[in-house]
């Protein structure tokens, strides 16, 4: 199976502190890989390295087999990034925000395509013409997710994508992620949500203090064992 993303012995230092230490993993095309860890584990640093915003001290980050450092422009055209706190304009409505940010990315999308993306993230039709200042945090997150979908890239990089969503919206999002993978998109998401990661991921990598300390694969039927992952996350053995 083709490899969409790979980290090869990545070591990254920020402000004099080593935040990733010899990290290696790969994401197969059409798979969901969840990088799980607590605050300060190095999750967001990993995403920023794949985006080329950070340069590794050693090792290589590759997208579609190409080094990020050597092919930055092409690689950014192949990836859509959803930051934990997406920048959206509160005085604009959902349509206006999406039109504006898509124009910056030089992506064309008509109203039907935008409505289809907002349908996929379950944003109520009657709210789409309202200013984002009237939205809940979860509703704003849905607009940000729709923007990532409209980029229509083969790879999605998601930083704590369910932050601010209620339990129903989280389940809807996880269903969406699985459907995107089934359509062939490759997804790297970072999260501290053990349950959500087990529900949606084909593979989980566990980061602790910048080191990859565990890996879990989805069985042929069902999902990754939540109890085993939770035990590893907490630093103890599963019962």
Segment roles from a protein language model:
Residues 36-38:
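The feature captures the beta-strand-to-loop junction immediately N-terminal to the Walker
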Residues 156-159:
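Catalytic Walker B motif of ABC-type/P-loop ATPase nucleotide-binding domains
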Residues 99, 103, 111-127:
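Conserved ABC ATPase "signature" region
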Residues 191-192:
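H-loop/switch region of ABC-family ATPase nucleotide-binding domains
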Residues 145:
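Hydrophobic anchor residue at the start of the ABC signature
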Residues 59-70, 75:
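Conserved ABC transporter NBD signature motif
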């Amino acid at each position: 199976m083709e490899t969409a993303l790979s980290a090869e012995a990545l070591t990254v230092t920020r402000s004099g502190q080593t935040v990733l230490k010899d990290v290696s993993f790969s994401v197969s095309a059409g798979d969901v890989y969840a990088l799980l860890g607590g605050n300060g584990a190095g999750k967001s640093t990993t995403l920023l390295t794949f985006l080329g915003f950070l340069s590794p001290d050693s090792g290589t980050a590759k997208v579609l087999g190409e080094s990020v450092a050597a092919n930055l422009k092409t690689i950014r055209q192949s990836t859509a990034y959803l930051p934990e706190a997406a920048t959206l304009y509160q005085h604009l409505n959902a349509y206006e925000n999406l039109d504006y940010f898509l124009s910056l990315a030089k992506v064309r999308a008509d109203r039907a395509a935008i409505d289809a993306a907002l349908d996929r993230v379950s944003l109520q039709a009657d709210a789409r013409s309202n200013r984002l200042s009237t939205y809940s945090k979860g509703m704003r997150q849905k607009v940000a997710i729709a923007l990532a979908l409209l980029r229509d890239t083969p790879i999605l990089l998601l930083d704590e994508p369910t932050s601010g969503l209620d339990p129903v919206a989280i389940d809807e999002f996880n269903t969406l992620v699985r459907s995107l993978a089934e359509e062939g998109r490759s997804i790297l998401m970072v999260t501290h949500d053990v349950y959500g990661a087990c529900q949606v991921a084909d593979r989980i990598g566990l980061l602790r203090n910048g080191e990859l300390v565990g890996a879990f694969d989805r069985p042929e039927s069902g999902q990754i064992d939540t109890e085993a992952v939770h035990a590893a996350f907490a630093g103890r053995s599963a019962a």
